[in-house]
Amino acid sequence: MGIDELYKKEFGIVAGVDEAGRGCLAGPVVAAAVVLEKEIEGINDSKQLSPAKRERLFDEIMGKAAVGIGIASPEEIDLHNIFNATKLAMNRALENLSVGPSFVLVDGKGIELRVPGTCLVKGDQKSKLIGAASIVAKVFRDRLMSEFHKMYPQFSFHKHKGYATKEHLNEIRKNGVLPIHRMSFEPVLELLTDDLLREFFEKGLISENRFEHIKNLLEAKKSVVFRKERTDHNLPLF
């Protein structure tokens, strides 16, 4: 008996929950919650599957399972941090399920959601439910990032999906930071200017809360640099 069946036997309806995009520099974090009645062949950790197989399994899961998807925006990531934004996306995924699970299996550790459950480290390799959720979250997010490429063709979001690849970092250096970048993340904050941040705000591309938060981070960063430079040269701080 697999791990999913053990929990189903004890709790009844069990959902697997996973996310995609937690470590990216751009775009949202996407979570999926999946309830499977019957096992689907080939489900595994989404990162170990080819893009073509992920797409095929995504369609099969969407057709045969109860699926909920939740998104936390770059703004929510900046304002609440990536851990809390990930929990927000996961809870939204659970809210969007058409059935109400009594227990959840969550990939990761230390994550408490609105439904009782347990966390499994590398859960997408141990649980078919979490594996299915990982596939749904990744394919949904990959498609979303491909749409961002159409909006911002100077960025290869259809390829690197917003991860901190060498190509993506070079694109930021060349073209500048976008509103969909996670401005609280290094190295995005390092490459963001005060003028560009204010331009985003004045054009209505970011909220006042986000503007003030990132402005404070930029000012704090300048203060740290100032202190380091003075200390390195044995100069008084004030």
Swiss-Prot record:
Catalytic activity as recorded in UniProt: Endonucleolytic cleavage to 5'-phosphomonoester
Compartment(s) where it occurs, according to its Swiss-Prot or TrEMBL record: Cytoplasm
GO biological process: DNA replication, removal of RNA primer; mismatch repair
Residues that bind a divalent metal cation: 18-19, 107
Keyword entries, A-Z: Cytoplasm, Endonuclease, Hydrolase, Manganese, Metal-binding, Nuclease
Cofactor (UniProt): Mn(2+); Mg(2+)
Gene3D superfamilies per UniProt: Ribonuclease H-like superfamily/Ribonuclease H
Cysteines paired by S-S bonds: none
SUPFAM superfamilies noted in UniProt: Ribonuclease H-like
PROSITE patterns cross-referenced by the UniProt entry: RNASE_H_2
Domain RNase H type-2: 12-197
Free-text remark on how the cofactor is bound: Manganese or magnesium. Binds 1 divalent metal ion per monomer in the absence of substrate. May bind a second metal ion after substrate binding.
Enzyme class, UniProt record, top EC level: hydrolase
GO cellular component, one term: cytoplasm
Primary subcellular site in the record, as a coarse category: cytoplasm
Highest taxon, organism lineage: Bacteria
InterPro entries referenced in this protein's UniProt entry, alphabetically: RNase_HII, RNase_HII/HIII, RNase_HII/HIII_dom, RNaseH-like_sf, RNaseH_sf
Pfam families, A to Z: RNase_HII (PF01351)
GO MF term set: manganese ion binding; RNA binding; RNA-DNA hybrid ribonuclease activity
E.C. no: 3.1.26.4
PANTHER family, alphabetized: RIBONUCLEASE H2 SUBUNIT A, RIBONUCLEASE HII
Similarity comment: Belongs to the RNase HII family.
HAMAP family (alphabetical): RNase_HII_B (MF_00052_B)
Entry function: Endonuclease that specifically degrades the RNA of RNA-DNA hybrids.
Name by which UniProt lists this protein: Ribonuclease HII
Species this protein is from: Thermotoga petrophila (strain ATCC BAA-488 / DSM 13995 / JCM 10881 / RKU-1)
Organismal lineage: Bacteria, Thermotogati, Thermotogota, Thermotogae, Thermotogales
Gene: rnhB
